[in-house]
Design a protein with these regions (language model features):
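Small-residue-rich segments of transmembrane alpha-helices in multi-pass membrane proteins
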Residues: 2-7, 127-142, 188-193, 253-272, ...
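Extended hydrophobic alpha-helices typical of membrane-associated regions
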Residues: 219-340
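Multi-pass membrane catalytic core of lipid/isoprenoid biosynthesis enzymes
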Residues: 51-96, 185-228, 262-266
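Functional transmembrane core segments of multi-pass inner-membrane proteins
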Residues: 11-18, 128-182, 194-198, 205-208
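Membrane-embedded alpha-helical segments that form the functional core of polytopic membrane enzymes
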Residues: 5-44, 96-110, 150-170
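Intramembrane alpha-helical segments
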Residues: 62-148, 152
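Acidic (Asp/Glu-rich) catalytic motifs at the cytosolic membrane interface
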Residues: 30-59, 165-188, 193
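C-terminal ends of transmembrane helices
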Residues: 37-42, 107-120, 168, 172, ...
Length: 340
């Protein structure tokens, strides 16, 4: 919902209009493609997930197939069902450009782990995931709205795309040991821990310097820049964990991967609300239905984040066989299913 809402809000900020039917179609496409990717990754990443000695709450797959709770065949069949739903929704899109973009999005999502491309096994997964989820996703949502594309949409999409690349580096960092055992050559595995930390620090610095530069040039509304800069502490927390060796300790690694993941939806929701406030201050408020949907999405995310943060504070227990037991966790936020 947040990825779709991000693109729709940027389109509304540009054109002032909102189409509920096209939003619902885009949302259905996003959900079906997200489920397809999740089931596909579970199936084709099974060997790597089995080899992972220390999965976190946010990495190493859902463990559903590893623990035998679902058969691999069912996971693959579910991926195909979701794929067919996505194809049907693509056929209903109004223009050739939106249909081609949707097909390209589904193809990249499928071949993220599926052969023959297996992009996440060739150090291309981080960029692919960012391109699909926070690049093509918002662009498709915007193209299906009356407002269409704008320079602001491209700038904001570039910001969250870079954040997603950095997030995926951390996710794959956590899975590095198991990935290397099965020959899964993610970008994080290719770089190694020290260079991942350096790249993460450089990426965060470049990103927020870019936000400041865009705001100074008048390309980014002041409130949007403030909302995006307010999320920088999450990245600093992750970087501190990388430098302090937190990834070597399961509980601390959970915290690092959690905040690496949360920096994205925090930025997305903050940008959405800032754009709506910017419109209101200009005297051209967004359509009421979209304000209700956007604010509702943000409230749901805030509730989920609060609950998840509280759950993460509960102590884990270790069984006699060494198995760590975590507290029950809420359903994943958008993007968690792309765990490598």
């Amino acid at each position: 919902m947040m990825v779709t809402g991000f693109g729709v809000t940027l389109a509304v900020h540009t054109g002032g209009a909102f189409s509920l039917p096209w939003y619902l179609l885009t949302l259905g496409f996003a959900w079906s493609t997200h489920l397809m990717t999740h089931f596909c990754n579970e199936y084709f990443d099974l060997e790597a997930d089995r080899a992972n000695p220390s999965p976190t709450s946010w990495t190493g797959g859902s463990r559903t197939l590893v623990d035998g709770l679902l058969s691999p065949t069912v996971s693959l069949a579910s991926a195909f069902v979701a794929l067919f739903v996505g194809i049907a929704l693509t056929a209903a899109m109004p223009t050739l450009s939106t249909r081609l973009l949707a097909v390209a999005l589904m193809a990249l999502a499928w071949f993220y782990t599926a052969p023959p491309l297996r992009l996440n096994y060739r150090a291309l997964g981080e960029v692919t995931c960012a391109t699909v989820l926070y690049g093509m996703g918002p662009l498709l949502a915007a193209l299906l709205q009356p407002g269409g594309l704008s320079a602001l949409l491209l700038w904001c999409t570039a910001v969250v795309c870079l954040l997603q690349v950095l997030r995926c580096l951390i996710m794959n960092f956590a899975d590095m040991e198991g990935d290397r055992l099965v020959g899964k050559n993610t970008l994080a595995a290719a770089l190694g821990p020290i260079r991942v930390a350096r790249l993460y620090a450089s990426g965060q610095g470049v990103l927020y310097a870019g936000v400041l530069a865009l705001a100074a040039a008048g390309e980014l509304p002041f409130l949007v820049a403030v909302a995006q800069l307010a999320c920088a502490p999450a990245g600093l927390h992750v970087l501190r964990g990388l430098l302090n060796g937190a990834m070597a300790e399961p509980r601390k690694a959970d915290g690092v991967t959690f905040w690496a993941s949360m920096q994205l939806p925090l930025t997305t929701c903050g940008t959405m609300i800032a754009l709506l406030v910017d419109l209101a201050l200009r005297g051209t408020p967004a359509p009421t239905p979209w304000i209700v949907i956007a604010v509702g999405t943000t409230v749901v995310f805030a509730g989920w984040l609060t609950r998840t943060a509280l759950v993460s504070r509960r102590p884990t227990t270790t069984a006699a066989d060494g198995t760590r037991t975590r507290p029950a966790e809420p359903a994943p936020v958008e993007g968690q299913a792309e765990r490598a």
